[in-house]
From Swiss-Prot:
One Gene Ontology cellular component annotation held by this UniProt entry: cell outer membrane
Gene Ontology terms, MF aspect: peptidyl-prolyl cis-trans isomerase activity
Protein family per UniProt: Belongs to the PpiC/parvulin rotamase family.
Lineage of source species: Bacteria, Pseudomonadati, Pseudomonadota, Alphaproteobacteria, Rickettsiales
Name the record gives this protein: Parvulin-like PPIase
Catalytic activity: [protein]-peptidylproline (omega=180) = [protein]-peptidylproline (omega=0)
UniProt-annotated location(s): Cell outer membrane
Broadest EC class assigned to this enzyme: isomerase
Alphabetized PANTHER family for the sequence: PEPTIDYL-PROLYL CIS-TRANS ISOMERASE HP_0175-RELATED, PEPTIDYLPROLYL ISOMERASE
Amino acid sequence: MKKLSVIFLSVSMLSSIAFCDQDKVVATYKGGEVKESQIMQEFKPQLNLQSGETIKNFDDFPLQDQEKLIKIYVNNLLLKEEVAKSSITSSKEFQEKLENAKNQLAQQELLANYIKSNITDKMFDDEYNKYVDNLKGKEQIKVAHILVKSQKEANTVKTKLSKGGNFNKLAEEFSLDKATASNGGVIGYIILNQSGQLVPEFENKAFALKVNEVSTPVKTDFGWHIIKVLEKKPVPIPTKKEAKVTIDNILAAEILKKYISDLEAKADLKIMLPKANSKTGS
């Protein structure tokens, strides 16, 4: 029995040593060092949630992302030390903000738990089927645009394009949409009349274009657009797994709306403001 215990102890020690060897130090600073395991413990849950994929090892991240995570982690530690050295947390203003933050966090947790406990498999399946039926037979287009402030600027860009100007270069030079300008003005794929995408004026003009066709200037609340359609293809039908986030968000919005409405009804909420069309002189 003693011999067996020694074997188990040896194996345990070797496993610990192997684990320590694998847990590399990825950064040092005056306050200490940072190991891979610390980074993974801090960021893995939220990164998995954002990417939808299971990230197992620190090395799974691209090198530039590894550096970003290390800097974020160390900066948080350094700021935590600065906070500890200050008297900021004892001020009345901070305590009030802290209480507000706690209340908001508690409300968010309450709503998240309520939504989670009220989404059934049947609700998910029904909403998924409705979502899929709405996508069947629809077309999606890949669009790019150049956004400018005035119609005069839009006409100038359109003239340059008509004379053989390169759309990508003109987008980079003229577009006010900095999120897309450096990528040739590419917005991505859109579906006609799909909630939460682009404004109707833009969509209607875009879906009337042929592939590689460039629009005349289009006015929206954002300014003037020159639109180009890069590709057209049928909308792919997502699996339940692929559509899960979308369906969960749809159901969450519906459940939340009803929950708040029920709370208002129970509280017998009465708004005492005058009607909008009953103002004096209207």
